[in-house]
Curated annotation (Swiss-Prot):
One of its GO terms (cellular component) is plasma membrane. This is Probable terminal-alkyne amino-acid exporter. The gene is besF. Residues 6-137, 150-281 form the EamA domain. It comes from Streptantibioticus cattleyicolor (strain ATCC 35852 / DSM 46488 / JCM 4925 / NBRC 14057 / NRRL 8057) (Streptomyces cattleya). Gene3D superfamilies: 1.10.3730.20. PANTHER family: EAMA DOMAIN-CONTAINING PROTEIN, TRANSPORTER, DRUG/METABOLITE EXPORTER FAMILY. Belongs to the EamA transporter family.
Amino acid sequence: MKLSKAVWALVLTVVTWASAFPAIRVGLDGYGVAGLSLSRLTVASVALAIAAGPLGVRRPRARDLPMIALCGATGMSAYQVLLNWGEVHVPAGTASLLIAIAPVFSVLLAAVFLGERMTWAQIAGSAVAISGAAVIAVAGGHARYTTSAWVVLAAAVVQGVYHFATKPLLARYTGLEVACYAMWAGTVFLLPLLPAMVHGFATAPVAATASTVYLGLLPSAIGFVSWGYAVARLSVASSTASLYLVPPVALVVAFVWLGEVPPPLALVGGALGIAGVMLINRRTLGRRREASTPGRR
């Protein structure tokens, strides 16, 4: 059976986003947390700036700049720094399991600040997912792992804030446009880390530099473009369901690339986390249809 271009775009998105977690581990060797964070965003920002014209990315309105700044500060700047910091001691696959529960925090924020009523399924799903995160956090058996796991969980929280903050913007811009604006804003916020980036480019091993460029070009730039292409042509249910594949693919890539095997208890916690998110999404897919479609103005 011949697969459509949209399905192939979805496959590309899942694989590139999943491969980002082990690629971070490689990039940290030579760049460190600060250098890798800015380097990845810089590469992605340049790539998206070049592609912005052909892709029809419009200039944002001035009144939307504060919300764009919030999206950049949370979903790009803070997320990159926290995830990279956490992956210093947390295996790549384990980190992907923690990040997978980010939708939980988006739902909780919507309930608190937008007054969106949570269903029993959402409440139960949130409890299950957060319980899974707690299990993952203690799965390593030593203090450095546990501390780093909570840092990765903090990255999931700011990612949830990002998804929450994009809601009003997605009423006026495409998903790709919002991603571009946030990427560019996030890069500006991390410019104080420029010395670390320059030092990394000058001294890091070739593998670390190649991994850093890969992170910027594929997961951060091409990944957003392919995701936008796919969700504009496929059902929201299919697109959302595909994201459940990111952690399993990340686990496989991390094993093949780095030889990493996560703690068994982390896999149990990850299964709980994904199950909780699936329970939440059963009740939210209908409401997320408009916000998840990049072609919507």
